[in-house]
């Protein structure tokens, strides 16, 4: 593939295009001001909003909706805190109304999370599939958070999900891409965008996900809990751009043996024998 500076490289989800391949979370920041500056520094164009936490004015979420310029950033309501498919479907509907209140009348996106496991926060594959099927029927653009299960990813694609979002490692763990082999299988077989979600701790791991062929990453804790969230957000921004460019450029094939970068003919010793 030959790239030029004018080569378009938009990420399309549903009917919406994005330039940035970094999706950011809005939780865990030390203040709304730091969140605002971090989002600006990241260059992101879509952020997740935990519908239940906004509704209940949970710590760090009071004033969240008013703090973001929704004319520039697309809202991705999520169903965090839902343990069953029924709960997730109900909260997704509330999320659609929340997006409308923010001025995004045509926003039907939902990040689907069905998590009954309170210790490791691992998603329920059965509840996720059940909720996804119903929400797709209702016209939602469903972005499901899942374990790195290639079969489940394909099934969710088949029922009409707009993306699949396999976890790199447990939410907030900072363990990186522990499921890289399975994520690669998902990427290889997917016909919808693959967004690596959860577990990314440092920019190099975000770059790795894009180098593998992931279409985007979602990062929250690694930015919000950094010593300097604003600078970390910028670091993630450049790492993701670098990873994407590397993927599009095509990496050097791996070899079992060395391959010299200098010519092996016409060397000095050879010239002296003549």
Swiss-Prot record:
Its EC number is 2.8.1.10. It is found in: Cytoplasm. 1-deoxy-D-xylulose 5-phosphate binds at residues 172, 198-199, 220-221. One of its GO terms (molecular function) is thiazole synthase activity. Keywords: Cytoplasm, Schiff base, Thiamine biosynthesis, Transferase. CDD domains: ThiG. Its main location: cytoplasm. It comes from the Bacteria. GO terms for cellular component: cytoplasm. Residues 251-274 are annotated as: Disordered. Signal peptide: none annotated. It catalyses: [ThiS sulfur-carrier protein]-C-terminal-Gly-aminoethanethioate + 2-iminoacetate + 1-deoxy-D-xylulose 5-phosphate = [ThiS sulfur-carrier protein]-C-terminal Gly-Gly + 2-[(2R,5Z)-2-carboxy-4-methylthiazol-5(2H)-ylidene]ethyl phosphate + 2 H2O + H(+). Pathway: Cofactor biosynthesis; thiamine diphosphate biosynthesis. The active site is at 111 (schiff-base intermediate with dxp). The keyword Cell membrane does not apply. GO terms for biological process: thiamine diphosphate biosynthetic process. Disulfide bonds: none annotated. It is an enzyme of class 2 (transferase). Homotetramer. Forms heterodimers with either ThiH or ThiS. Catalyzes the rearrangement of 1-deoxy-D-xylulose 5-phosphate (DXP) to produce the thiazole phosphate moiety of thiamine. Sulfur is provided by the thiocarboxylate moiety of the carrier protein ThiS. In vitro, sulfur can be provided by H(2)S. This is Thiazole synthase. The lineage of its organism: Bacteria, Bacillati, Cyanobacteriota, Cyanophyceae, Synechococcales.
